[in-house]
Amino acid sequence: MGSSHIPLDPSLNPSPSLIPKLEPVTESTQNLAFQLPNTNPQALISSAVSDFNEATDFSSDYNTVAESARSAFAQRLQRHDDVAVLDSLTGAIVPVEENPEPEPNPYSTSDSSPSVATQRPRPQPRSSELVRITDVGPESERQFREHVRKTRMIYDSLRMFLMMEEAKRNGVGGRRARADGKAGKAGSMMRDCMLWMNRDKRIVGSIPGVQVGDIFFFRFELCVMGLHGHPQSGIDFLTGSLSSNGEPIATSVIVSGGYEDDDDQGDVIMYTGQGGQDRLGRQAEHQRLEGGNLAMERSMYYGIEVRVIRGLKYENEVSSRVYVYDGLFRIVDSWFDVGKSGFGVFKYRLERIEGQAEMGSSVLKFARTLKTNPLSVRPRGYINFDISNGKENVPVYLFNDIDSDQEPLYYEYLAQTSFPPGLFVQQSGNASGCDCVNGCGSGCLCEAKNSGEIAYDYNGTLIRQKPLIHECGSACQCPPSCRNRVTQKGLRNRLEVFRSLETGWGVRSLDVLHAGAFICEYAGVALTREQANILTMNGDTLVYPARFSSARWEDWGDLSQVLADFERPSYPDIPPVDFAMDVSKMRNVACYISHSTDPNVIVQFVLHDHNSLMFPRVMLFAAENIPPMTELSLDYGVVDDWNAKLAICN
């Protein structure tokens, strides 16, 4: 792995500090920076660029590199271990004074309350050092990806913790906390605790560990990842006042349709500069060549690519929008034009760099169409549009465009696990439930069963994994809307079983699955130990729930890096889960989920219709944010060379 520094010369005079305006809504500016030309508006850009260059004392070496390479990255590199240092002739090597790293200062649990005013140290400012990370091998990428996963896990856990703390203060039926407000609070707390990624550098190009197609639900989450450094501005850039040569450089943009003159064509984007809008999102005055607008022009001049994140309206249980990382684009042209409202705006033509994975926004739109009109985008390959035959709340598609195999149609679909006869009769006398008419809350019997905390938030998201979750059952007085009734409501997201060259059969979702979201039950015919031994001797392959591994999710809900006095809750041990499931004749969609030691789905044991600790239901939850059309995977707790999916499906 290497990093290359942008050639910035500290001897050059910096320009005044340029503060980015909020996007898409900004305050109106009182003074115009220019008068709209009567003839060619594009001449304004040439004039502004010319004046900027004349006022800047460039060295001859720097001019030579800039004009010949059209790039801010030097072509000659000296290799020192894993760091690529630019040729000193370009003026790129800038001595940086070593400042001692500030110590992390975790909050106390009481600091999460808005009623507690705590004086916090001023967070460390972002670095002004621009680098590009190169030569990331598979193992390094895996480590970066794991670091991203853990950081996102802390962010999601903290955001939900803050939401639940406010809900406790407001009581059952009280005012709910604003999701975006707590998202910002969680981001700020992680910044104060030095948990933001890549804050010690500004990365140009790809962020190691962040993949094209990754989905985020809040702008602050983009900041935590280092993908986009400003929670409100649509253009993230290094300001001229921080740049050693006085030139701002853009590193990423958010395309959210906030400007009326934007034109998004997928691989090509006509991006409107920032500024000049009123509170209603209408262009109310001319834009100026400053801040992010100037940074975009400078990145175009030097050939520096920018990361593009698209913000899309997408109703879900977490927020009303999603942000999708769509990869790297180059700014190939810029001009000044008259916008739809008659005011001058800067426009930039962005073209996607070839050779990248398919854009996540395109996949998202494709999956939306599959849910409503699948044959319009996939005229061949669909075998059945509901293999559950109406037993699930939503249809389960079956798709195969590889061969003529239709095996999933030959099994009886089982929406829930079938337990041994008499189990429910034996347990009915021991049934006990809550009397929460409006839904479970503090002091509830079901809360006590779950070690003093309900396992889900008010959106039905799993707060943290437990050995066993007791959901409300038939003996409880709470309504179906109770937040302690999640898995018993059944399948809610659209799933598709598909033929795969790698795994035989696989499962993917047509919906966005956020971390902690319930997916479905893993259903089959439950067998006692004695029954399982007999079938095993006959050569039948069984599924053993106790073998499922969810070790990668054990840290979910651990906030010890943010809250100094946080104590991880302890839960009572449960008897070993000692039953098997036969799926040779009856099964559901979950049985086609592939095996992986790096899964994106976890197993959670749940009870709701009986009290036998020996026979919990096997429920599946998303272990991370899963984009549409991404294959789901489970860790079946078997060795890597073992046949995928326990040889169930092939």
From Swiss-Prot:
Gene3D superfamilies: SET domain (2.170.270.10), SRA-YDG (2.30.280.10). InterPro entries: H3-K9-MeTrfase_plant, H3K9_HMTase_SUVAR3-9, Pre-SET_dom, PUA-like_sf, SET_dom, SET_dom_sf, SRA-YDG_sf, SRA_YDG. GO terms for molecular function: DNA binding; histone methyltransferase activity; zinc ion binding. Residues 493-637 form the SET domain. It is found in: Nucleus; Chromosome, Centromere. Zn(2+) 2 binds at residues 434, 446, 472, 476. Residues 1-24, 95-129 are annotated as: Disordered. The keyword NADP does not apply. Residues 205-352 form the YDG domain. Disruption phenotype: Impaired gene silencing due to decondensation of chromocenters leading to the derepression of DNA-methylated genes and transposable elements (TEs). Residues 7-20 have a biased composition (Low complexity). One of its GO terms (biological process) is gene silencing by siRNA-directed DNA methylation. One of its GO terms (cellular component) is nucleus. Component of an RNA-directed DNA methylation (RdDM) complex that contains at least MORC6, MORC1/CRT1, MORC2, SWI3D and SUVH9. Interacts directly with MORC6, MORC2 and MORC1/CRT1. Interacts with SWI3B, SWI3C and SWI3D. This is Histone-lysine N-methyltransferase family member SUVH9. It comes from Arabidopsis thaliana (Mouse-ear cress).
